[in-house]
Amino acid sequence: MFSRFATRYNALFEKAPIMTMCLTAGTLGGISDAVAQGLTIYQTNKNAMIGLDGVRLNTHPEIPSIKRVLQFVTFGFAISPFQFRWLRLLSAKFPIEKGAINVVKRVLLDQAVFAPFGTAFFFSWMTLAEGKGFRGAYDKLQAVFWPTLKANYMVWPFFQTVNFWLMPLQYQMPFACTVAIFWNIFLSLKNASSMQESGSQEIELF
C-alpha cells in the first residue's frame, strides 16, 4: 500500500512538483490546526465551571473553527512555492554527495534565512486573514516573533539535519510537513493565545 502511494506521489511530483507540495503542506497544515483546536477545546470544556447541583454552567461549549483550519490550509498553499524553491536551491548548491559538511551548510542557511522568513510569514498571514490589517500583523510580530524563533531553534535544526541527510528532494517537504504537524500545533496554540491576550487588553482599555 505504501509503495503504491509512493509511486503515485512520485508521479504527481514529476508532473507538477509545486502543486504537489502545496497540496501536501495545505492538507497537513489543516490537520495540525484541527488537532490543536481539539486539544484547546477539550481542555476548555473540561475545565468549564460546574454549579453546586452538578450542572455545567457553560451551556455553550466551544466548537472548532472551520475558518481557522482554512487559514492553515491556505498558509500551507501560500508558503509552499517559496519553501520548495528554497529546498531545491539548497539541494543544487550543496549536494550531499560532496560530503557531510554540505548538510551542515544547508541546515545553517535554512535556519538563518528561511526560519525567520517562515515565522514572519506565518504570523503575518494569520493576522491578515483575521482581518486585522498590516498594523495588526506588525503588532503580532512584535509580540511573538522572537519567542517563536527561539523555540524554532530548539527543535528544527535536528529535524532538518535528518531531513537533508536522509531524504531526497521530493520527500524533504513531506518529511518537514509531517514534523510540522506538531510544530504547527505549537504555532496554532501560540497564535490563538496571542489573540486572546490582545482581546483582553482591548476589554481593559475600553
From Swiss-Prot:
Question: Is rRNA processing one of the keywords?
Answer: no
Q: Which GO terms describe its cellular component?
A: cytoplasm; mitochondrial inner membrane; mitochondrion
- List where the protein spans the membrane: 107-127, 169-189
What would you give as a GO molecular function for this chain, any one? channel activity
Q: Which UniProt keywords apply?
A: Membrane, Mitochondrion, Mitochondrion inner membrane, Transmembrane, Transmembrane helix
- Any single biological process term in GO: mitochondrial transmembrane transport
Q: Does the keyword tRNA processing apply?
A: no
Predominant location category: mitochondrion
Q: How does it sit in the membrane?
A: Multi-pass membrane protein
| InterPro entries reported for this sequence | Mpv17_PMP22
Localization terms from the record: Mitochondrion inner membrane
Q: Which family does it belong to?
A: Belongs to the peroxisomal membrane protein PXMP2/4 family.
| Protein name per its UniProtKB record | Protein sym1
Task: Tell me what organism the protein belongs to.
Answer: Schizosaccharomyces pombe (strain 972 / ATCC 24843) (Fission yeast)
Task: Name the gene for this chain.
Answer: sym1
